Amino acid sequence: MAKASLLILAAIFLGVITPSCLSDNILYSGETLSTGEFLNYGSFVFIMQEDCNLVLYDVDKPIWATNTGGLSRSCFLSMQTDGNLVVYNPSNKPIWASNTGGQNGNYVCILQKDRNVVIYGTDRWATGTHTGLVGIPASPPSEKYPTAGKIKLVTAK
């Protein structure tokens, strides 16, 4: 009994002192990226630039951007609790949004290993920059499971 209480207390304590963002490629609901801050995964970087442009880079090549550069300076990116990803200027006025706001909940913006940036809670928005076939079965469905929910089997030609 004492050991169980000690384990519960340790878990609570660790939860309190552990940073909320344990991964370099995830932005959680309520978190922000200030100027110069970024998400990264391998050679991919999703950065809030000084000129207020939010840009996805593959090494040093820009792949996607909000095209908000020059509209202000020192902006920040917010992953809102309603699922909307928004770039705000220093006066807290939105200058770009993913337009994915809906119900309040727990959402994450993830820079994935396929280079795509996706908002999850329910898939609400993506940059569309993925490099591979993600979410598509590697082999045909088995007879036991002839369909995989809403996933359609796609074969390469």
UniProtKB/Swiss-Prot annotation:
Gene Ontology MF terms: D-mannose binding
Keyword terms, alphabetized: Antiviral protein, Disulfide bond, Lectin, Mannose-binding, Plant defense, Secreted, Signal
Disulfide bond sites: C52-C75
Keyword set includes Ribonucleoprotein: no
Gene3D superfamilies xref list: Bulb-type lectin domain
Signal peptide: 1-19
Practical application: Can be used as a chimeric variant with insecticidal venom toxins to obtain biological insecticide candidates. This lectin has receptors on insect midgut and this allows its internalization into insects hemolymph. In an other hand, scorpion and spiders toxins are naturally not toxic when administered orally to insect larvae, but a fusion with this lectin makes them toxic for the larvae that would eat them.
Any coiled-coil regions, as ranges: none
Example of a GO biological process term: response to virus
Amino-acid positions noted as binding alpha-D-mannopyranose in the UniProt annotation, renumbered to this chain: 49, 51, 53, 57, 60-61, 64-65, 67, 80, 82, 84, 88, 95-96, 99, 106, 112, 114, 116, 120, 125
Function of the molecule: Mannose-specific lectin which binds alpha-D-linked mannose. Displays a high affinity for alpha-(1-3)-mannose oligomers. Displays antiviral activity and therefore may contribute to defense against infections.
Further remarks about this protein from its record: Inhibits the attachment of HIV viruses to susceptible cells. Has a significant inhibitory effect against various viruses including HIV-1 (IC(50)=0.4 ug/ml), HIV-2 (IC(50)=0.3 ug/ml), and SIV (IC(50)=0.8 ug/ml) in MT-4 cells. Also inhibits human CMV replication in HEL cells (IC(50)=0.9 to 1.6 ug/ml) and inhibits syncytium formation between HUT-78/HIV-1 and MOLT-4 cells (IC(50)=2.7 ug/ml), and HUT-78/HIV-2 and MOLT-4 cells (IC(50)=3 ug/ml).
Subunit structure: Homotetramer.
Name this polypeptide is given: Mannose-specific lectin
